[in-house]
Amino acid sequence: MERGTRNKRRAPVPRSDFRVPRSGELPPIDRTYKLFIGGTQARPDEGYSRKILAPSGALLAEVAEGNRKDIRNAVEAAHAAEGWAKTSGHNRGQVLYYLAENLAQRADEFAERISGMTGRDAGDARREVDASIARLFSYAAWADKYDGAVHQTPIRGVTLAMNEPMGVIGIACPEAAPLLGFVSLVGPAVAVGNTVIAIPSEAHPLAATELYTVLDSSDVPAGVINIVTGAKDALAKVLAEHDDVDAVWYFGSQTAGAEVERASAGNMKRTWVEWHARDWADSRHGEGREFLREATQVKNIWIPYGE
């Protein structure tokens, strides 16, 4: 369920709840998160933002409301980073390892943000952050190990099955576990060489927007990970309709998932749609070969030989 209201922000305006701070007290800070496109924070096309409220009703921050034009910009940035697919698996793993290390340095901050945003207790929020860090380390290790295979054929010859990245993947992340769900989907996609446009949890997007500075400081090339906040179902449909997006992953409602599949049919886009609850903290359901298979396509090469 979306918290807050949608409001247009083109220039700073006086806050309605502003009060003169007491002696020794700092004034409130108006914090609005932008989009993350092409390695930089970008203002949304229409200038809209949405308030994100704590369960108590307190204002936590505001996030940008992305639209169709913002998705187009993100797709262009993702295509501009196609060199990521040519980077060796070892080097991609190093980048993910560095990302995990930098997230670990701010674990307390992320846990506090998740707790304040969702109302969960501090211990539960910290466990989600720790699981997210472990998952990034896991996919850093997988980056140079998800290889292909060699098959024998009935005729004289062998067939090489080579795993290749899909290209540009649009990912609509689940509402549950806002940080862990995000990392569990983006991690495997980029580990095998894809670039992504990620739509974080609509109700709890701050776990993803806090990652902007972590991505900035972790040597992630510009355009490899793009984050567009906003109405998840509407943005997912835009991704599904875009001819330059090679695959779409959608984790949300059954109705919107069916719409994503229909919108993808026109350009024969590969889809991965789930509307059933998934335990992201359980490694049997939240990570593994299933995710790597969805992030890759197999190229088969037949090599004949004689006596």
Specify the residue positions occupied by each region the protein language model found:
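Conserved small-residue-rich beta-alpha loop and adjacent elements
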Residues: 146-221
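Periplasmic-binding protein-like
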Residues: 187, 247-251
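Short acidic active-site motifs
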Residues: 157, 234-235
